[in-house]
Amino acid sequence: MFRTFGRRLVSCTLPLLQSAPHDLPEGFEFMEHKVVNKDIHAPHENLEXLRLTLTRQDEFLLREEPVKCVTVTGTNGEYGIYPGHAYKIVQLNPSPLTVEYTDGTTKKYFVSGGFAHINNEGSCDVNTVECTLLDDLDLAIAEKELAAQQAALGSAKDDKAKSVVEIRISVIEAVIAALKHH
């Protein structure tokens, strides 16, 4: 499979590589039997709505939904993403994700991690491991689970088990913080 894919990719991109270096596009996207030039610095300033796709593993929660903006928290801080935002890929922390619709309503989700792919042509794809509406989470249950995981941390037998429990604790603490500020 990879041999034929690699051969097709090379055969499609070979003409680009043989041309003068200044003729190479800055970015390109491989599609079946064609190469499409992409300008990652193209100005897209007159966009009215951001097209948001929000996925959880293999399930769509939102599919190219027109929204005013989305707020995500990444490893480098919080990002407010509006139409025409610069191209960026953001690694998400366990935190709330806020979606503001064009009619002014908002929905808050909790994401356990993932990536946000912000495209400068007015779309944003947020791919998460787990994502749920913040209203569906219960603070009392989260606090009970935190106590149970802290007890399990003391009884962890090896480093692997301890690491798994520490990850659970950090996500549950993020859920509790999000629920307290909601």
Curated annotation (Swiss-Prot):
Its main location: mitochondrion. InterPro entries: ATP_synth_F1_dsu/esu (IPR001469), ATP_synth_F1_dsu/esu_N (IPR020546), ATPsynth_dsu/esu_N (IPR036771). GO terms for molecular function: proton-transporting ATP synthase activity, rotational mechanism. Pfam families: ATP-synt_DE_N. It is found in: Mitochondrion; Mitochondrion inner membrane. Residues 1-17 form a transit peptide. Transmembrane segments: none annotated. It is a peripheral membrane protein. Keywords: ATP synthesis, CF(1), Hydrogen ion transport, Ion transport, Membrane, Mitochondrion, Mitochondrion inner membrane, Transit peptide, Transport. GO terms for cellular component: mitochondrial inner membrane; proton-transporting ATP synthase complex. It comes from the Eukaryota. Mitochondrial membrane ATP synthase (F(1)F(o) ATP synthase) produces ATP from ADP in the presence of a proton gradient across the membrane which is generated by electron transport complexes of the respiratory chain. F-type ATPases consist of two structural domains, F(1) - containing the extramembraneous catalytic core, and F(o) - containing the membrane proton channel, linked together by a central stalk and a peripheral stalk. During catalysis, ATP synthesis in the catalytic domain of F(1) is coupled via a rotary mechanism of the central stalk subunits to proton translocation. PANTHER family: ATP SYNTHASE DELTA/EPSILON CHAIN (PTHR13822), ATP SYNTHASE SUBUNIT DELTA, MITOCHONDRIAL (PTHR13822:SF7). Belongs to the ATPase epsilon chain family. F-type ATPases have 2 components, F(1) - the catalytic core - and F(o) - the membrane proton channel. F(1) has five subunits: alpha(3), beta(3), gamma(1), delta(1), epsilon(1), plus the additional subunit P18 (Tb427.05.1710) that is not present in F(1)F(o) ATP synthase from metazoa. Subunit P18 (Tb927.5.1710) interacts with the alpha subunit with a 1:1 stoichiometry; the interaction is direct. Subunit gamma is part of the central stalk. F(o) has three main subunits: a, b and c. This is ATP synthase subunit delta, mitochondrial. It comes from Trypanosoma brucei brucei.
